[in-house]
């Protein structure tokens, strides 16, 4: 007879093998097929705003890690310009309510340490703090030189133990 007590000591072991455990880290790379600029935002920046809105509506707390302060300000302004019915509560890192808004926009010199569910990374290099997240969203831009940097980040996520996926936006 098998002792079923191990299920209580190690609850994740009795999950369906295909079911993700709460500890599994996932990185999804969105493939972009163009770099159309609209309203002062690149295609990837437009997509970041849409993904952040979608994840916030799903009840997640999001950190958007920008390449620099100028990019953070562009995203901040774009999120403020959304119609009232699609408003996304957000703030630049270090601003807003205590604990931050559900969506925080940061850059390398300015990042809060409040808990977030998802990292949306616009960084061209692998963000060393990405390993603190169980879900990361990254991008494979249209431009060839930026694709090579995305390949390097993909390898870094794999080495960090992330389950890797690719996707396209609807």
Question: Where in the sequence are the language-model features?
Answer:
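N-terminal polybasic/positive-inside topogenic patches
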Residues: 2-5, 9-21
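SF2 helicase motor core recognition
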Residues: 112-116, 121-130
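Short His-Asn-centered micro-motif
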Residues: 65-68, 106-108, 120-123
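Short Lys/Arg-rich amphipathic alpha-helical segments
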Residues: 38-41, 45, 71, 88-92, ...
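Glycine-rich, aromatic-bearing surface loops/beta-hairpins
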Residues: 134-170
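Helix-adjacent hinge/juxtasegments
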Residues: 75-113
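Long, hydrophobic N-terminal alpha-helical segment
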Residues: 17-67
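Short coil/turn segments at beta-strand junctions that form active-site/ligand-binding loops
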Residues: 60-61, 116-117, 134
């Amino acid at each position: 007879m098998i002792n079923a007590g191990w299920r209580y000591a190690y609850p994740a072991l009795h999950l369906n093998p295909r079911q993700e455990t709460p500890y599994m880290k996932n990185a999804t790379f969105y493939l972009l097929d163009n770099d159309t600029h609209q309203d002062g935002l690149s295609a990837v920046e437009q997509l970041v705003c849409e993904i952040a809105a979608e994840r916030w509506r799903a009840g997640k707390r999001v950190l958007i890690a920008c390449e620099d302060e100028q990019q953070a300000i562009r995203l901040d302004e774009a999120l403020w310009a959304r119609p009232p019915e699609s408003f996304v509560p957000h703030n630049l890192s270090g601003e807003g309510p205590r604990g931050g808004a559900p969506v925080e926009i940061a850059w390398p010199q300015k990042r809060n340490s409040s808990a977030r569910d998802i990292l949306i990374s616009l960084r061209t290099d692998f963000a060393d703090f990405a390993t603190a997240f169980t879900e990361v969203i990254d991008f494979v831009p249209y431009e060839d030189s930026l694709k090579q940097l995305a390949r390097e980040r993909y390898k870094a996520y794999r080495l960090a133990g992330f389950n890797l996926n690719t996707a396209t936006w609807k």
